[in-house]
UniProtKB/Swiss-Prot annotation:
Iron recorded as keyword: yes
Binding site residues for S-adenosyl-L-methionine: 153-154, 185, 206-208, 282
Cofactor notes: Binds 1 [4Fe-4S] cluster. The cluster is coordinated with 3 cysteines and an exchangeable S-adenosyl-L-methionine.
Source taxon at top rank: Bacteria
NCBIfam families the record matches: rRNA_mod_RlmN (TIGR00048)
Presence of the UniProt keyword Metal-binding in the record: yes
Cofactor: [4Fe-4S] cluster
Annotated transmembrane regions: none
Misc remark: Reaction proceeds by a ping-pong mechanism involving intermediate methylation of a conserved cysteine residue.
Active site: 88 (proton acceptor), 325 (s-methylcysteine intermediate)
Domain Radical SAM core: 94-314
GO biological process, one term: tRNA methylation
Protein name from the UniProt record: Probable dual-specificity RNA methyltransferase RlmN
């Protein structure tokens, strides 16, 4: 697929086909700036070369197959990504902002207790083209102001393709977005150091408990990617510039919502310039956890602020269409596809 290729790769494509070197830049402009969906649109490339391109290459653009709309304006898109596989993307409009939450894997290996995506298992990484197609193909593509890699999957378990997609989004030959418009979420997976070194996008870390043993029960990935090691890596990086790091903390009733947890959270984050986002737990099937109530979340927030941290309670969006944090799953769509085939 041409979508997801770098300028260098597109130039190589052009040269292999006997086209002039500058045709690589033409291809990049048509793919990333003009967002062409068909080679026939590329009118400054000869008809003969357009035909050859179409015979050899897939442009990588395809439409969504379903969309659901929430009462709060949130929209959830379903995208096919190969035979019988799907991913979901979520559009979150808010005032003059439009944030798209995109997926990086089909399912997820991390198997977090509170997340529906992990319950469906892992069925492959997305290519850079499949990641970018989500951005290009939603109805609101031209209105997007921010991107968050917080959909299905662990982005830094698919570091190569995630970084390729970010390159196409932020380089001048691509979409030319500021990295400040993009946030990548992780539990602290193996690609963290490379992400910090090779991109300038914001980082969000899924934390959820300051106590490693408790976190391991909620997030089995703690065994392979200990939070304390993740925090050491983050401390070693200079976040004094415009790049930000935030920590996501789902607040569970009677589990991690007391002042002991708040104080320990403050202790382990000491010295890291960061924001803490408190998130309500959204009920999913076969999981007995419950969300903490507003009063306890507010008390937790104030305690974190007393320790000198910026702490906010994040608004829930799209819960009625299973588009809120931890609720994305394409198991039903994939099951329906299998039955119809």
């Amino acid at each position: 697929m041409l979508l997801g290729m770098s300028l260098e790769e597109l130039t190589t494509v052009a040269l292999r086909m006997g086209m002039p070197r500058f045709a690589g830049k033409q291809l990049a402009e048509w793919i990333y700036v003009r967002r062409a969906t068909d080679f026939a649109e590329m009118t400054n490339i000869s008809q003969a070369n357009r035909q050859k391109l179409a015979e050899i290459y897939d442009l990588g653009r395809y439409p969504w197959s379903d969309v659901q709309c929430s009462v709060d304006g949130t929209k959830k898109y379903l995208f096919p990504v190969g035979e019988g596989r799907f991913v979901e993307s979520v559009l979150i409009p808010e005032g003059d902002r439009a944030t798209l939450c995109i997926s990086s894997q089909v399912g997820c290996k991390m198997d977090c207790l509170f997340c529906m995506t992990g319950k469906q298992g892992w069925n492959g990484n997305l290519s850079a083209a499949e990641i970018l197609n989500q951005i290009f193909s939603v109805d609101e593509a031209a209105e997007l102001t921010n991107l968050v890699y917080m959909g299905m999957g662990e982005p830094l378990d698919n570091t190569d393709e995630v970084l390729r997609s970010i390159e196409a989004l932020t380089e001048p030959w691509g979409m030319g977005w500021s990295p400040k418009r993009i946030t990548v979420s992780t539990i602290g997976a193996k690609g963290l150091e490379r992400f910090l070194a090779e991109s300038r996008c914001h980082l969000a870390v899924s934390l959820h408990s300051p106590f490693p043993e408790e976190r391991r029960k909620l997030m089995p990935g703690e065994k392979a990617f200990p939070i304390m090691q993740t925090l050491d890596r983050i401390r070693a990086y200079d976040f004094s510039g415009q790049r930000r790091v935030s920590f996501e903390y789902i607040v569970f009733d009677g589990l991690n919502d007391d002042m002991r947890h708040a104080d320990e959270l403050a202790a382990i984050l000491r010295g890291i310039p960061c924001r803490i986002n408190l998130i309500r737990f959204h009920k999913i099937p076969a999981v007995s956890l419950r969300s903490s109530d507003t009063a306890r979340m507010e008390a937790f927030r104030k305690r974190m602020e007393s320790h000198g941290f910026t702490c906010t309670i994040r608004a829930s969006r799209g819960e009625d269409i299973f588009a809120a944090c931890g609720m994305l799953s394409t198991s039903k769509a994939e099951s329906s596809e299998e039955k119809s085939s």
